[in-house]
Regions:
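Short, small/polar-rich loop/turn modules that mediate ligand/substrate recognition or access, typified
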Residues: 78, 171, 176, 242-244
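Active-site loop immediately N-terminal to the catalytic Tyr-X3-Lys motif
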Residues: 90, 144-150, 172-173, 188, ...
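Active-site helix of classical SDR
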Residues: 112, 155, 163
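Residue(s) in the substrate-gating loop at a strand-loop-helix junction
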Residues: 139
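Substrate-binding pocket helix/loop in short-chain dehydrogenase/reductase
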Residues: 88-89, 96-101, 212
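Alpha-helical segment proximal to the catalytic Tyr-Lys
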Residues: 117, 168-169, 240
Length: 256
């Protein structure tokens, strides 16, 4: 049975990814900053769960030690944990900037690096020649910066640069590194963003949602399962020759 570890798996996109990977036959290590969320999802799926703060290398190293002590390897790492706040550029504070970069950029870097250091020494997957796979959940804001999200967009641009550089350096070890760029996803975090944006723009939440829909050529809001499906593909053998890529899964909103 292949195994995977997903950060930020206690809710939203991360939970959907964990659920999909379990259906795909993976043993999934469910991790989250909030231990009770990780426990709830882990118990629901019958999978191990860990409290992990991705901004703390010690937490990530402890998680790696648990995984390798029990399983001896890690086939797939999904760096999903992330945060978002919203504010006009002229009103942004250093604290907001630092918070977004600490989790989205530094947290993704620490997560990928910590597990890649162990992956390089493990044997390839049977019959595939790939040692392991790293997937980072970025955002369409990493391709097309968004108003009110200068700090968030910049932190996700950093993730794409990290993915490309890591893909080049880890290719000789036969470790693939890719990103997924979601758009307007129906999650609790998105609901908070809708409320913030409505307040900042003087609109109702319903008007903000309709604006999102107008910007999405395929005409609906994204579900967490849409993102999970792309991660499932990247985890499988059909994606073994893909690395350094950022897959847009946002209904075409990024080209609007």
């Amino acid at each position: 049975m292949p195994n995977a570890l997903v950060t930020g798996a206690g809710t939203g996109i991360g939970r959907a990814i964990a659920e999909r990977l379990v259906r795909d036959g993976f043993k999934v290590w469910v991790t989250d900053l909030k231990e009770e969320w990780a426990q709830e999802v882990g118990e629901a799926l019958g999978m191990p769960h860990l409290k992990v703060d991705v901004t703390r290398r010690a937490d990530l190293e402890q998680a790696r030690e648990r995984v390798y002590a029990e399983d001896g390897r890690l086939d797939l790492l999904v760096a999903n944990a992330g945060v978002s706040t919203m504010n006009p550029f002229l009103d942004l504070t250093e604290e907001e900037w630092d918070f977004n970069f600490a989790v989205n950029a530094k947290g993704t870097f620490l997560t990928l690096q910590t597990f890649a250091r162990a992956m390089v020494a493990q044997p390839p997957m049977p019959g595939r020649g790939v040692r392991g796979k790293l997937v980072a959940i970025a955002s369409m804001a990493a391709r097309q910066a968004a108003p009110l999200l200068a700090h968030y967009s910049a932190s996700k641009f950093a993730v794409l640069g990290l993915v490309q550089a890591a893909a080049k350096e880890l290719a000789p070890y036969r470790i693939t590194v890719n990103a997924v760029n979601p758009g307007f996803v129906r999650t609790s975090m998105q609901e908070r963003e809708v409320a913030w944006e409505a307040r900042l723009r003087g609109l109702t939440p319903e008007e903000v949602v309709q604006d999102y829909l107008r910007q999405t050529p395929l005409g609906r809001l994204e579900a967490p399962e849409d993102v999970a499906g792309v991660v499932s593909f990247l985890a499988g053998p059909d994606a073994d020759f893909i690395t350094g890529e950022a897959v847009e899964v946002n209904g075409g909103a990024w080209i609007f």
